């Protein structure tokens, strides 16, 4: 019995191990995902092509995200065309800092283990400051929606020399580690729009 993995590779490894051992593999649904495999299969059945935009709209509508009744807020499904601006000659201006978190004891032990096992590998963990607890992940989410989300949309694809993060959320690791639920991240972003603190272009783009 295993929780449904989020990668085909891992699923294949599990199935191979079970087959080799003569054990039946029973998968439990991973509720972290917004759409189950069965639900996606029903949506995809009999479609000539699988495109992101129709699926995105279906998920928005079914979850009621940025919706006004049965229609998207403002009448537009996406703001991609508006969110490809550059910074101009003066550059991005002041970019809010991403919060950093002091490694806890478990993380410090893991860093030491990596240093011992892979001393010659590239990179360094000396400045590791990612959230590794639920509490820190929530702090990272709050910092993003309040400080960087409002300016995220229009220049989300823009780059500038020396700018490493810009206004991006840096929440993917916390989501992948399941320190954050995608539903609460979506709700937090939408709440900023509903409260008038972030524009629809930024919130929908995120």
Residue ranges and their predicted role:
Residues 2-129:
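Beta-rich, aromatic/charged-enriched effector core domains that present basic-aromatic interfaces
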Residues 1-2, 148:
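Functionally constrained cores in energy, signaling, and assembly domains
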